[in-house]
């Protein structure tokens, strides 16, 4: 039977003394005079499976006693077992780290607690050769080096664990919202609006910008083209969509429209930011999960966010315990304990922005970023609150309206908005959300104050004109969640093929 290494490690007793077929890649091999040991991994499980290969030579059978002994041995053999078909010299020639193999053999228990079972190989076939230039030889490699070979690094123990956890977390999020009665929707990748108001968007165009206003061969043409672009003198009516368009930074506005018809929705897809930052926290392409809920206020929004996070943590601990245990030992001490504690927390703390600011100002800690009312919290502030002061996740609510987006609902004090950020240890802000402004006149006034053209968002205002209601939602940066779940500290290490400033290889 053809099975995976994960199947064997989870329930080895089902396969003892049975002939099985495995495919995988060589992680390591060791040679003795009459034995070859192969560490095989197929990507389904953290640990390698040991394959033992030994050459069996056929003995000449001459006497009646030898004939009888031969037949008795055949009876003792399981009916699945057959003589080895292995030539050690030929096997040694084809074995290289990274090669892909198919192995047929019998799973046998051992007396070694470190290797409780192994495959006694009967046949080994080379599926894909490798050679000495394969960069993942059996030694320790830095993460910086592995980022240069993102197409191969998933074959390491570390990144195999990371991307198995990513898979579990991805489907756990879908599972949570489906169980809660949410509808999954697909929001546009190409958009004409800047939902976040940050202005750091990737623009799309079919116009030949290099030819504006003249060809590059003419002196100063590039400079003139840049000036033309900066003066906004390009006629985008001649472009594909007849206007400026961008890669989306959020699907929130469209999700609001869908929620005000389907009640509860979520979108989960790639988003793009053209931030020229080369830090461990920034990527140009990343994934966002954004739920939107009609008839939902801020406190209900917080409850959904907490339940979602705890559900995902529990699923990852259940399905990827060995992977997280490995990361606990190699990347972040006490990771399992921290995740368990958070998954079992009854109710996350909720603190107002002003209270958080006061805690930081009275901390006697020297921060690089200034603290004053109206200042956004920097990562160092967020980590102080979650790691030093509260030592647990905390919701920061009721933020100054000047530093939050136009669509967030004004509080009665008219100074703050019904916004929330969920801060967690090691990461800082994990989730950002708010109750949305449902009052049409207030929303128009806020757009005017922030100089947001009303004509571009008439459709968004229609959501308030026609049957508007209180509604709320939030955004979860998926890669930040993965940093939190894995104990890693760089966004480039939780995305298979990261796109960052001045870096796009694959």
UniProtKB/Swiss-Prot annotation:
Q: Give the reactions, separated by semicolons, that this protein catalyses.
A: tRNA(Asn) + L-asparagine + ATP = L-asparaginyl-tRNA(Asn) + AMP + diphosphate + H(+)
Provide the protein's localization.
Answer: Cytoplasm
Name a single GO biological process: asparaginyl-tRNA aminoacylation
Is the keyword Hydrolase assigned to this protein?
Answer: no
**Which terms does the record give in the GO molecular function aspect?**
asparagine-tRNA ligase activity; ATP binding; nucleic acid binding
Q: Output a single Gene Ontology CC term carried by this record.
A: cytoplasm
Record-linked PROSITE patterns: AA_TRNA_LIGASE_II
Q: Which UniProt keywords apply?
A: Aminoacyl-tRNA synthetase, ATP-binding, Cytoplasm, Ligase, Nucleotide-binding, Protein biosynthesis
Q: Name one Pfam family in it.
A: tRNA_anti-codon
Which InterPro entries is this protein grouped with?
Answer: Aa-tRNA-synt_II, aa-tRNA-synth_II, aa-tRNA-synth_II/BPL/LPL, Asn-tRNA-ligase, Asp/Asn-tRNA-synth_IIb, NA-bd_OB-fold, NA-bd_OB_tRNA
What is the protein's quaternary organization? Homodimer.
Report the sequence similarity comment from the record.
Belongs to the class-II aminoacyl-tRNA synthetase family.
Name under which the protein is recorded: Asparagine--tRNA ligase
- Organism the protein comes from: Onion yellows phytoplasma (strain OY-M)
- Underlying gene: asnS
